[in-house]
Amino acid sequence: MTRCEFFTENDRINGFSISGHSDFDEPGKDIVCAAISAVVTMAEATINDVCGAKDKVRVKDGENNRITLTLPASCDEEDSVQAVLTGMMLTLCSLRDDYPDNIEVLEV
């Protein structure tokens, strides 16, 4: 199962951590994993390249692949960044509703 954690405080999303594999199908054929990857990649690229927010991204490869993004305490494009992260969370929640055995979404 893929675990999607959103770090929130005072109605602000401070970052996220996505780990694991959805196990919907074998790697390379897993549409749930592909959808999650596309959503995460879009959010990370938008925050970095379009919004110009200076964030910290760590990617760890291995059996429990993980990507973690942590925002600074404030950024110039705060409203845009929060809109991107909220859209990401809503999209992942929609996937969770369709594939509850393969993805979980948590606010921590």
Report residues per predicted region.
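N-terminal intrinsically disordered, cationic/polar leader segments
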Residues: M1-I31, T41, A45-V108
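Short, conserved glycine- and acidic-residue-centered signature motifs
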Residues: V32-I36
